[in-house]
């Protein structure tokens, strides 16, 4: 997938994943990787930025498999931002699909 296209949709995918349940970083990388080829070096800076922008809150939870894990929780403003991105994504999809259909690509 084109890098710029991937970056554009990655925020929405991460926000939707964490809305379903709080996740720690590596768990989120594994979940997002099911639909987009990403690695930790892509996800962690995004998580930091979204946390700084108050879309996520973080908390530590003990782990039976090592040190405590830093979990991400979607805030109310994060939910609003996610819905805004979802609307933009739907609008973009509809526009692109309409354009392609008009030009013989169905």
Task: For each feature predicted by the language model, list its residue ranges.
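Amphipathic alpha-helical dimerization/coiled-coil segments
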Residues: 80-106
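Glycine-centered, phosphate/nucleic-acid-interacting loop/turn motifs that mediate DNA/RNA or nucleotide
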Residues: 54
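Short beta-strand "wing" residues that participate in macromolecule-binding interfaces
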Residues: 58
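N-terminal helix-turn-helix DNA-binding core of bacterial DNA-binding proteins
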Residues: 2-44
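Alpha-helical DNA-recognition elements
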Residues: 45, 49
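Basic, amphipathic "hinge/linker" alpha-helix immediately C-terminal to the N-terminal HTH DNA-binding motif
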Residues: 63-86
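Short, Lys/Arg-enriched, disordered terminal segments
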Residues: 1-3, 105-106
């Amino acid at each position: 997938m084109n890098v710029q296209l991937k970056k554009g949709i990655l925020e929405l995918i991460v926000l939707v994943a964490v809305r379903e349940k709080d996740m720690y970083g590596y768990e989120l990388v594994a979940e997002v990787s099911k639909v987009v080829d990403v690695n930790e070096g892509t996800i962690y800076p995004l998580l930091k930025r979204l946390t700084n922008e108050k879309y996520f809150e973080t908390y530590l939870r003990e782990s039976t498999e090592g040190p405590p894990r830093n979990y991400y929780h979607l805030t109310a403003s994060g939910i609003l931002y996610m819905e805004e991105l979802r609307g933009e994504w739907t609008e973009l999809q509809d526009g692109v699909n309409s354009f392609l259909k008009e030009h013989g690509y169905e």
